């Protein structure tokens, strides 16, 4: 869709907005519309359902906020024909719903609405006031939400799906008056994690309503769109072109780059870029919640204690991930957004919880330590900078000696184009990296808990890597596990199935990455944790000693049993030998009987005498087994 600057003036908007809304837009210093706003507002303010796919930072939030406020305003303040005053909204009813996949995005959407509503005139004709209510998980409970809903009677609900479904299941909440529903980041809301709740909510709403779906990657939602109950929707796609004239899903103000780098150097390269580049605020994306927690703790500590050799004291880090409470996440986001100390550089370390829809002013740089497992998230991450036609840079780090450079071509198929850049030079032969690694090892040795968190982060990264959609590019077999472990600050490689990919000649002895550490004396800084560790260590020592004692007793018992068995076997052998001797004597006596005519009684007597003589002979020879003619004839038996 091509537009010129004149056609984007608010005066040329093809819909007659409420007077107060026109004045509010003028007061907020929005001189012109963006293409997505110029296309969407007239359709959604009228009687059209819309599916809007537009690049990040293109003004999508205002593109649906204005139609929502227009519809609510008309419903509250316009007098129907034949009536003396507007029809009041019944108790328990709402007029509009806006759904978002994350609490942070929902909060930011509410801030946009409230910013416009602050300019609603303080006049009797604008009563009741237009109000919004935020419904997100872990921020209060459903009972508190209901109390607020009944007391304030908001017309616009801004919510995440789970909490909204719980809220709408209450009997007192009515949906029959609803006029419009918006799904922001609709592709995420319609994927497996939210789809069931979202479809249930939509089925609870009136069929005669307007529906708007908004996202930078709406095509990822696929056929699920048809389950949203839209009526003949208009699909709007607002895209840009790069300097080669190719369609680009990223805004032209956003410079997308990638660098090939040794895994071990990723963290220090990131720090060098943050230290040396000029920017106000930056966002650095990490793979997992645990890795954000690990690197945030590490860098916050090292920044405070860093000397001139690796001066990173001007960097101020913030942490944002899904394991934080809602209150902590919103507070962090607020502090990062409002930070304005000119002597500091503000860096938000985050997972993909900060990838969608969040609009933070003055974010000039985005760095991705690793690409996201879902390629559709890549553009959402990058889109936190270069918003509203401001210049921004987004850089993704790819591992050397792997197939990861193929990711660039993979993203080009999705109309996302990147240029290659070189890592910043370390002029003194990796001196920054080496100094940082020494400080990192010292940091790890100070507290056993830090190393445990590092190991957990490392294992989490390997699992994260194994789940990449582009598995032919991101292969576990090609990773440099030792280099990655050093980047995470590990003292020793953990035992895990993926270790089989490490070549035998490269595998360090017992997995130690540097000097061997005595794990019995490797202590926790936390006194209670250390006390518990020492108690467990003592228990383990006693248990080992007890086990050793039992093994020794069992060995003796086994030996005694073995000796008895041998004696029993010897006794049986002697009996067998005596039996053979007896049989031999009997045969000899029978032979003599035949030759000499001895009778049976004499044979028996002679046999007994022969045995007695043989025994006497054995005794006279010291029990040596006898040496006579008769005995000699038995020796080979």
Curated annotation (Swiss-Prot):
A Gene Ontology molecular function term of the record: RNA helicase activity
Bias (Gly residues): 621-630
Residue numbers binding ATP: 54-61
GO CC, alphabetical: 90S preribosome; nucleolus; nucleoplasm; preribosome, large subunit precursor
Residues forming coiled coils: 528-597
Location of the motif DEAD box: 184-187
Stretches for region Disordered: 554-637
Reaction(s) the record says it catalyses: ATP + H2O = ADP + phosphate + H(+)
Q motif, short sequence motif: residues: 10-38
Enzyme Commission number(s) from the entry: 3.6.4.13
Main location: nucleus
Keywords (A to Z) from UniProt: ATP-binding, Coiled coil, Helicase, Hydrolase, Nucleotide-binding, Nucleus, Ribosome biogenesis, RNA-binding, rRNA processing
Enzyme class: hydrolase
InterPro entries: CTT_SPB4, DEAD/DEAH_box_helicase_dom, Helicase_ATP-bd, Helicase_C-like, P-loop_NTPase, RNA-helicase_DEAD-box_CS, RNA_helicase_DEAD_Q_motif, SPB4-like_CTE
Transmembrane stretches, start-end: none
Ranges for domain Helicase ATP-binding: 41-236
GO biological process: assembly of large subunit precursor of preribosome; maturation of LSU-rRNA
Subunit record text: Component of pre-60S ribosomal complexes.
Family: Belongs to the DEAD box helicase family. DDX55/SPB4 subfamily.
PANTHER family: RNA HELICASE
Reported function: ATP-binding RNA helicase involved in the biogenesis of 60S ribosomal subunits. Binds 90S pre-ribosomal particles and dissociates from pre-60S ribosomal particles after processing of 27SB pre-rRNA. Required for the normal formation of 18S rRNA through the processing of pre-rRNAs at sites A0, A1 and A2, and the normal formation of 25S and 5.8S rRNAs through the processing of pre-rRNAs at sites C1 and C2.
Free-text note on domains in this protein's UniProt record: The Q motif is unique to and characteristic of the DEAD box family of RNA helicases and controls ATP binding and hydrolysis.
The name this protein goes by in its record: ATP-dependent rRNA helicase SPB4
Species in which this protein is naturally found: Lodderomyces elongisporus (strain ATCC 11503 / CBS 2605 / JCM 1781 / NBRC 1676 / NRRL YB-4239) (Yeast)
Lineage: Eukaryota, Fungi, Dikarya, Ascomycota, Saccharomycotina
Underlying gene: SPB4
């Amino acid at each position: 869709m091509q537009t010129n600057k004149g056609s984007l003036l608010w005066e040329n908007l093809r819909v007659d907005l409420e007077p107060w809304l026109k004045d509010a837009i003028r007061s907020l210093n929005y001189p012109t519309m963006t293409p997505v706003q110029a296309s969407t507002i007239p359709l959604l303010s009228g009687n059209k359902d819309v599916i809007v796919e537009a690049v990040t930072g293109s003004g999508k939030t205002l593109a649906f906020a204005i139609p929502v406020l227009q519809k609510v305003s008309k419903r509250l303040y316009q007098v129907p024909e034949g009536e003396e005053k507007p029809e009041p909204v019944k108790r328990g009813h709402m007029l509009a719903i806006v759904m978002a996949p994350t609490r942070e995005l929902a909060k930011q959407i509410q801030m946009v609405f409230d910013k416009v509503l602050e300019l609603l005139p303080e006049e009797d004709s604008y009563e009741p006031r237009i109000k919004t209510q935020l419904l997100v998980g872990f921020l209060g409970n459903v009972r508190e939400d209901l109390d607020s809903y009944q007391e304030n009677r908001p017309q616009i609900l801004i919510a995440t799906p789970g909490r909204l479904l719980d809220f709408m299941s209450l009997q007192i909440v009515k949906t029959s008056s609803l006029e419009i529903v918006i799904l922001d980041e609709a592709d995420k809301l319609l994927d497996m994690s939210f789809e069931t709740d979202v479809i249930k909510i939509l089925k609870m709403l009136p069929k005669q309503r307007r529906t708007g779906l908004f996202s930078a990657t709406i095509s990822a939602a696929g056929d699920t769109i048809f389950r949203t109950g839209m009526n003949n929707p208009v699909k709007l796609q607002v895209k840009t072109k790069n300097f080669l004239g190719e369609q680009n899903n990223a805004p032209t103000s956003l410079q997308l780059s990638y660098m090939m780098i040794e895994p071990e150097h990723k963290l220090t390269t990131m720090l060098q870029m943050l230290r040396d580049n000029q920017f106000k605020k930056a966002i650095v994306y990490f793979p997992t919640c645990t890795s954000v927690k690990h690197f945030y703790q590490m860098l916050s500590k090292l920044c405070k204690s860093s000397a001139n050799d690796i001066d990173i004291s001007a960097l101020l880090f913030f942490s944002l991930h899904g394991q934080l409470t809602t209150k902590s996440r919103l507070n962090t986001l607020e502090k990062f957004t409002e930070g304005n100390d000119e002597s500091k550089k503000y860096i938000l370390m985050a997972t993909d919880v900060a990838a969608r829809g969040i609009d933070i002013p003055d974010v000039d740089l985005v760095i991705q330590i690793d690409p996201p497992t879902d390629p559709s998230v890549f553009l959402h991450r990058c889109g936190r900078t270069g918003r509203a036609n401001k210049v921004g840079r987004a850089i993704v780090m790819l591992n050397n000696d792997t197939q990861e450079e193929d990711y660039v071509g993979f993203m080009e198929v999705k109309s996302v184009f990147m240029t290659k850049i070189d890592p910043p030079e370390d002029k003194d032969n990796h001196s920054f990296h080496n100094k940082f690694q020494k400080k990192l090892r010292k940091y790890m040795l100070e507290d056993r808990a830090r190393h445990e968190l590092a190991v957990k982060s490392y294992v989490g990264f390997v699992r994260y890597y194994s789940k990449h959609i582009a598995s032919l590019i991101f292969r576990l077999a090609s990773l440099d596990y030792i280099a990655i472990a050093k980047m995470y600050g590990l003292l020793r490689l953990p035992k895990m199935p993926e270790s089989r990919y490490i070549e035998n000649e490269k595998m360090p002895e017992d997995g130690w990455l540097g000097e061997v550490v005595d794990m019995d004396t490797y202590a926790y800084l936390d006194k209670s944790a250390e006390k518990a560790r020492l108690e467990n260590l003592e228990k383990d020592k006693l248990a080992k000693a007890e086990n050793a004692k039992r093994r020794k007793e069992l060995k003796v018992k086994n030996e005694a049993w073995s000796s008895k068995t041998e004696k029993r076997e010897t006794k049986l052998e002697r009996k067998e030998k005596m039996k053979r001797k007896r049989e031999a004597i009997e045969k000899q006596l029978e032979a003599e009987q035949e030759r000499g005519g001895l009778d049976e009684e004499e044979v028996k007597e002679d046999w007994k005498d022969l045995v007695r003589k043989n025994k006497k002979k054995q005794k006279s020879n010291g029990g040596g087994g006898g040496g006579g003619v008769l005995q000699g004839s038995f020796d080979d038996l």
